[in-house]
Each structure stands twice: as structure tokens, then as C-alpha cells.
């Protein structure tokens, strides 16, 4: 029996004022040695068009970061697919996937809510562990 390596997916979300929909989602995945296994920083244009972001005053900063290719602009459905493909890749490579966040319960709840609001079904398509 081999021991699984841990992959820590450190994630963060930013939400809108009105309905708490996620308009900004980012993650960095590392192993226990700090090697980066993947990362993304996504802005969801479909959510921004529908909702007033909580950090509306930061939108200009997001635009600058998008021009520098730090943030990627996409839709929520594409972001969800990218995240789940990343998780699938980690699991296929034999990693034990652990989601981490300052308030992981909140992040998971608002991601699931945004997924429902945009008709994308369950946000997470793979079983993972949660570290809050």
C-alpha cells in the first residue's frame, strides 16, 4: 500500500453585494514542500455583468492585472470546468486533494450557490477534503 502525497489547494473567492455570487476565484496548489502544482486567478465576466461586485472599487486594479495576464477573464462555467479538471489531474496523479482557505466553508458555499444560479449543477465534481 503506497502513501498518497498531499496536494493543498489554497483558494479564495470575492463575491457580489446583492446575491453573494462569486466574480473572482483564485487558487494555488502546492505539495508539502511548497512546490507549486498549479494555479489560476479568474474573473467571471458573466457574474460581473449581472451583479455589483463587493469590491467594486478594485475593478480598475483587476483590469490592470488582466492586461498583465495575471487575471484571466472567463465565464463561471469555464472557471468551474478548469477547477474540476485541475482536481481530476491531481487525483489521477495520485494526490490526496485538500481544499484550504481562510474561510473554506464560506468559499465552498458561495461557489456552490453561484454554480446553482448559473445552472452549472454541483460545483465540485470530485470528492476532496476540506481544511478550514
Q: Could you describe each region identified by the protein language model?
A:
Residues 1, 29, 121-125:
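Short, conserved catalytic or adaptor-binding loops enriched in Gly and charged residues
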Residues 58, 129-132:
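Residue-level detector of functionally special positions within alpha-helical transmembrane segments
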Residues 31, 48, 120-121, 132:
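Short, surface-exposed, charged/polar-biased interaction segments
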Residues 105-130:
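Substrate-recognition/cap helix-loop segment adjacent to the acidic, metal-dependent catalytic center
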Residues 2-9, 13-105:
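Conserved non-catalytic scaffold segment of RNase H-like nuclease domains
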Amino acid at each position: 500500500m503506497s502513501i498518497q502525497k498531499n496536494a493543498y489547494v489554497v483558494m479564495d473567492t470575492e463575491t457580489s453585494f446583492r446575491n453573494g455570487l462569486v466574480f473572482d476565484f483564485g487558487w494555488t496548489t502546492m505539495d508539502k514542500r511548497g512546490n507549486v502544482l498549479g494555479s489560476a486567478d479568474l474573473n467571471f465576466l458573466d457574474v460581473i455583468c449581472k451583479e455589483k461586485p463587493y469590491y467594486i472599487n478594485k475593478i480598475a486594479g483587476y483590469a490592470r492585472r488582466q492586461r498583465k495576464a495575471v487575471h484571466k477573464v472567463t465565464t463561471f462555467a469555464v472557471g468551474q470546468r478548469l477547477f474540476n479538471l485541475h482536481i481530476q489531474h491531481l487525483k489521477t496523479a495520485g494526490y490526496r486533494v485538500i481544499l484550504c482557505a481562510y474561510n473554506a466553508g464560506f468559499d465552498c458555499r458561495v461557489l456552490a450557490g453561484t454554480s446553482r444560479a448559473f445552472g452549472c449543477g454541483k460545483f465540485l465534481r470530485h470528492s476532496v477534503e476540506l481544511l478550514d
